């Protein structure tokens, strides 16, 4: 069935090239895992003491860590794929400032997607109880902490644990803001400007 002239998918770029299937899969998988981790992080942070058993809290936190490491691995694959597979160009009618804004938002997203799990890994490695609480990726494979941090004295580790935790939290809020701008920009182009940019990233 042909699209009508009123369809938000009709425009000068209606036939725009799509991202590759691998890029689309990585994009939505990373997005889903990040949203899941946001929910798990909020559960761990906002639930009052005693709301969950120690075992349940440990499960939530360990799952949060496992997803974070998975996101880091997928982000590396995403960057490697992008470097070897040129993404489709933005529509020619986009003004320069929008092109620059889109590029800046993508760079910020990549930086934060790496910074979040890395800061979390550093935070976890500086935990004073890390040596007696091995980390297992989804309960299956033991994941190493960062050795030189674990070998520091307890006072230094406690200080670093707090600092890396604050950095992890700051990165999370920055990621929320950039994601909100990214989504708002995509919806603006789709529904107001009538450019079919969303279709490029749809499965």
Question: Model-derived features: where do they sit?
Answer:
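Membrane-embedded alpha-helical bundles that constitute the cytochrome b-like, heme-associated redox core
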Residues: 1-203
């Amino acid at each position: 069935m042909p699209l009508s002239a009123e369809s938000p998918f009709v425009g000068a770029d209606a036939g725009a090239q799509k991202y590759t299937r691998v890029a689309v899969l990585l994009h939505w998988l990373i997005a889903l895992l990040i949203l899941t981790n946001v929910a798990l992080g909020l559960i761990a942070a906002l639930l009052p003491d005693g709301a969950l058993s120690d075992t349940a809290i440990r499960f939530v936190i360990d799952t949060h860590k496992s997803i974070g490491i998975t996101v880091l691995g997928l982000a590396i694959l995403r960057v490697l794929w992008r470097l070897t597979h040129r993404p489709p160009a933005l529509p020619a009618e986009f003004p320069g400032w929008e092109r620059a804004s889109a590029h800046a938002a993508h760079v910020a997203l990549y930086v934060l997607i790496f910074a979040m799990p890395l800061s979390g890994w550093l935070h976890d490695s500086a935990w004073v109880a890390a040596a007696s609480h091995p980390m297992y990726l989804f309960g299956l494979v033991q994941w190493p902490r960062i050795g030189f941090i674990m070998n520091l004295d307890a006072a230094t580790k406690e200080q670093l644990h707090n600092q890396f935790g604050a950095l992890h939290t700051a990165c999370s809020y920055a990621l929320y803001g950039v994601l909100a701008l990214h989504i708002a920009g995509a919806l603006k182009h789709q529904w107001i400007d009538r450019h079919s940019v969303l279709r490029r990233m749809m499965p």
